[in-house]
A protein has these predicted regions:
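ATP-dependent adenylation/nucleotidyltransferase module used to activate substrates
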Residues: 1-156
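Immediate flanking context of iron-sulfur cluster ligation sites
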Residues: 154-175
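Iron-sulfur (Fe-S) cluster-binding segments and ferredoxin-like electron-carrier domains
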Residues: 172-197
Protein backbone atom coordinates (compact mmCIF):
# COMPACT_ATOMS: atom_id res chain seq x y z
CA UNK A 1 0.00 0.00 0.00
CA UNK A 2 2.82 2.34 0.92
CA UNK A 3 4.80 1.53 -2.24
CA UNK A 4 1.98 1.38 -4.79
CA UNK A 5 -0.97 3.26 -3.34
CA UNK A 6 -4.17 1.87 -1.87
CA UNK A 7 -6.08 2.11 -5.17
CA UNK A 8 -3.41 0.04 -6.95
CA UNK A 9 -3.61 -2.93 -4.55
CA UNK A 10 -5.98 -5.88 -4.91
CA UNK A 11 -5.75 -8.55 -2.23
CA UNK A 12 -6.50 -12.06 -3.48
CA UNK A 13 -7.73 -15.01 -1.46
CA UNK A 14 -8.24 -18.54 -2.70
CA UNK A 15 -10.85 -21.13 -1.83
CA UNK A 16 -9.24 -24.46 -2.66
CA UNK A 17 -11.21 -26.84 -0.48
CA UNK A 18 -9.29 -26.05 2.70
CA UNK A 19 -10.75 -27.50 5.88
CA UNK A 20 -11.87 -24.17 7.35
CA UNK A 21 -12.82 -20.66 6.25
CA UNK A 22 -11.32 -18.63 9.09
CA UNK A 23 -8.34 -17.54 6.98
CA UNK A 24 -10.75 -16.15 4.38
CA UNK A 25 -12.69 -14.28 7.05
CA UNK A 26 -9.40 -12.86 8.38
CA UNK A 27 -8.38 -11.81 4.86
CA UNK A 28 -11.73 -10.07 4.27
CA UNK A 29 -11.43 -8.20 7.56
CA UNK A 30 -7.82 -7.17 6.88
CA UNK A 31 -8.64 -5.94 3.36
CA UNK A 32 -11.59 -3.94 4.68
CA UNK A 33 -9.50 -2.43 7.48
CA UNK A 34 -6.72 -1.53 5.04
CA UNK A 35 -9.31 -0.26 2.54
CA UNK A 36 -8.03 -2.29 -0.39
CA UNK A 37 -10.02 -4.28 -2.93
CA UNK A 38 -10.38 -7.97 -2.14
CA UNK A 39 -11.19 -10.72 -4.61
CA UNK A 40 -11.83 -14.36 -3.80
CA UNK A 41 -10.89 -16.92 -6.45
CA UNK A 42 -12.40 -20.41 -6.30
CA UNK A 43 -10.15 -23.41 -7.02
CA UNK A 44 -12.27 -26.10 -5.38
CA UNK A 45 -11.07 -28.89 -7.65
CA UNK A 46 -7.61 -28.71 -6.07
CA UNK A 47 -8.93 -30.66 -3.07
CA UNK A 48 -10.10 -33.41 -5.42
CA UNK A 49 -6.66 -33.73 -7.00
CA UNK A 50 -4.50 -33.86 -3.87
CA UNK A 51 -4.94 -35.83 -0.67
CA UNK A 52 -3.43 -33.77 2.14
CA UNK A 53 -4.28 -32.62 5.65
CA UNK A 54 -5.20 -29.06 4.63
CA UNK A 55 -8.03 -30.21 2.37
CA UNK A 56 -9.00 -33.47 4.09
CA UNK A 57 -10.30 -32.87 7.60
CA UNK A 58 -10.22 -36.61 8.32
CA UNK A 59 -6.41 -36.58 8.19
CA UNK A 60 -4.51 -35.62 11.31
CA UNK A 61 -1.81 -33.03 10.75
CA UNK A 62 1.67 -34.52 10.82
CA UNK A 63 5.14 -33.08 10.41
CA UNK A 64 7.36 -34.53 7.74
CA UNK A 65 9.96 -37.09 8.77
CA UNK A 66 13.19 -38.27 7.18
CA UNK A 67 13.26 -35.47 4.61
CA UNK A 68 9.63 -35.82 3.55
CA UNK A 69 7.21 -32.91 3.49
CA UNK A 70 4.52 -32.56 6.16
CA UNK A 71 1.13 -33.88 5.09
CA UNK A 72 -0.04 -30.25 4.97
CA UNK A 73 1.85 -29.80 1.69
CA UNK A 74 -0.58 -29.14 -1.16
CA UNK A 75 1.37 -29.91 -4.36
CA UNK A 76 1.30 -27.04 -6.84
CA UNK A 77 -0.84 -24.76 -4.66
CA UNK A 78 1.39 -21.68 -4.92
CA UNK A 79 1.91 -22.31 -8.64
CA UNK A 80 -1.86 -22.22 -9.12
CA UNK A 81 -2.23 -19.18 -6.89
CA UNK A 82 0.38 -17.28 -8.91
CA UNK A 83 -1.06 -18.44 -12.24
CA UNK A 84 -4.57 -17.31 -11.33
CA UNK A 85 -3.24 -14.07 -9.83
CA UNK A 86 -1.38 -13.36 -13.08
CA UNK A 87 -4.45 -14.14 -15.18
CA UNK A 88 -6.58 -11.82 -13.06
CA UNK A 89 -3.78 -9.25 -13.05
CA UNK A 90 -3.74 -9.33 -16.84
CA UNK A 91 -7.43 -8.40 -16.94
CA UNK A 92 -6.89 -5.37 -14.71
CA UNK A 93 -3.52 -4.32 -16.13
CA UNK A 94 -1.39 -5.46 -13.19
CA UNK A 95 2.02 -6.96 -13.87
CA UNK A 96 3.34 -7.13 -10.33
CA UNK A 97 2.36 -9.93 -7.95
CA UNK A 98 3.27 -9.98 -4.26
CA UNK A 99 3.23 -13.28 -2.36
CA UNK A 100 3.98 -13.93 1.31
CA UNK A 101 6.03 -17.13 1.05
CA UNK A 102 9.10 -17.76 3.20
CA UNK A 103 11.62 -20.53 2.71
CA UNK A 104 13.50 -19.84 5.93
CA UNK A 105 11.26 -21.69 8.37
CA UNK A 106 9.59 -25.03 8.92
CA UNK A 107 9.08 -27.39 6.05
CA UNK A 108 10.97 -26.14 3.03
CA UNK A 109 7.93 -26.57 0.81
CA UNK A 110 9.28 -26.53 -2.77
CA UNK A 111 6.77 -23.88 -3.86
CA UNK A 112 8.01 -21.46 -1.18
CA UNK A 113 11.62 -21.45 -2.39
CA UNK A 114 13.29 -18.63 -4.30
CA UNK A 115 14.12 -20.80 -7.32
CA UNK A 116 10.42 -21.62 -7.68
CA UNK A 117 9.47 -17.93 -7.47
CA UNK A 118 12.09 -16.99 -10.09
CA UNK A 119 10.92 -19.82 -12.34
CA UNK A 120 7.26 -18.81 -12.04
CA UNK A 121 8.13 -15.21 -12.84
CA UNK A 122 9.78 -16.37 -16.07
CA UNK A 123 7.02 -18.86 -16.89
CA UNK A 124 4.22 -16.34 -16.35
CA UNK A 125 6.06 -13.72 -18.40
CA UNK A 126 6.31 -16.21 -21.27
CA UNK A 127 2.72 -17.40 -20.86
CA UNK A 128 1.27 -13.88 -20.92
CA UNK A 129 3.71 -12.37 -23.39
CA UNK A 130 4.71 -9.54 -21.06
CA UNK A 131 7.04 -9.06 -18.13
CA UNK A 132 5.50 -10.26 -14.88
CA UNK A 133 7.27 -9.37 -11.64
CA UNK A 134 6.79 -11.49 -8.54
CA UNK A 135 7.82 -9.96 -5.25
CA UNK A 136 8.28 -12.20 -2.22
CA UNK A 137 9.33 -9.74 0.51
CA UNK A 138 9.33 -12.42 3.24
CA UNK A 139 11.32 -14.94 1.16
CA UNK A 140 14.45 -15.06 3.31
CA UNK A 141 12.97 -13.96 6.65
CA UNK A 142 12.35 -16.35 9.51
CA UNK A 143 9.25 -15.91 11.68
CA UNK A 144 11.05 -13.76 14.26
CA UNK A 145 12.22 -11.44 11.47
CA UNK A 146 8.71 -11.31 10.02
CA UNK A 147 7.35 -10.25 13.43
CA UNK A 148 10.15 -7.66 13.52
CA UNK A 149 9.05 -6.33 10.15
CA UNK A 150 5.47 -6.03 11.41
CA UNK A 151 6.79 -4.14 14.43
CA UNK A 152 8.95 -1.84 12.27
CA UNK A 153 5.83 -1.02 10.25
CA UNK A 154 3.97 -0.19 13.47
CA UNK A 155 1.60 -3.12 12.97
CA UNK A 156 2.80 -5.83 15.36
CA UNK A 157 -0.29 -5.88 17.58
CA UNK A 158 -2.63 -5.54 14.60
CA UNK A 159 -0.99 -8.44 12.75
CA UNK A 160 -1.02 -10.59 15.89
CA UNK A 161 -4.72 -9.93 16.45
CA UNK A 162 -5.94 -10.11 12.86
CA UNK A 163 -3.80 -12.59 10.95
CA UNK A 164 -4.47 -16.31 10.98
CA UNK A 165 -2.11 -19.27 10.88
CA UNK A 166 -3.70 -22.27 12.62
CA UNK A 167 -4.12 -25.31 10.37
CA UNK A 168 -7.14 -26.41 12.42
CA UNK A 169 -8.92 -23.08 12.02
CA UNK A 170 -8.88 -22.10 15.68
CA UNK A 171 -9.12 -18.30 15.82
CA UNK A 172 -6.75 -17.86 18.77
CA UNK A 173 -4.60 -20.77 17.57
CA UNK A 174 -4.75 -24.38 18.71
CA UNK A 175 -1.19 -24.22 20.13
CA UNK A 176 -0.72 -27.77 18.82
CA UNK A 177 -0.32 -27.75 15.04
CA UNK A 178 3.05 -27.03 13.38
CA UNK A 179 1.83 -23.66 12.05
CA UNK A 180 0.84 -22.49 15.54
CA UNK A 181 4.14 -23.67 17.00
CA UNK A 182 6.09 -21.83 14.31
CA UNK A 183 4.09 -18.62 14.78
CA UNK A 184 4.34 -18.72 18.59
CA UNK A 185 8.05 -19.58 18.59
CA UNK A 186 8.77 -16.79 16.10
CA UNK A 187 6.95 -14.21 18.22
CA UNK A 188 8.61 -15.49 21.39
CA UNK A 189 12.04 -15.30 19.72
CA UNK A 190 11.35 -11.78 18.43
CA UNK A 191 10.25 -10.56 21.87
CA UNK A 192 13.33 -12.16 23.48
CA UNK A 193 15.57 -10.37 20.96
CA UNK A 194 13.81 -7.09 21.75
CA UNK A 195 14.45 -7.55 25.47
CA UNK A 196 18.14 -8.27 24.82
CA UNK A 197 18.63 -5.07 22.83
Amino acid sequence: IHDYGRDQVVALSFVYGQRHSIELEAAKKMAATLRVSHKIIFLNTLAELSDNALTNSEKSIQSGENGSYPNTFVPGRNALFLLYAAIYGDTIGARRLVIGVSEADFSGYPDCRADFIFSMEETLSLALGKKIIIEAPLQYLNKAEIWGLADALGALDWVEENSHTCYLGVKEGCHECPACHLREEGLKRYRALQQES
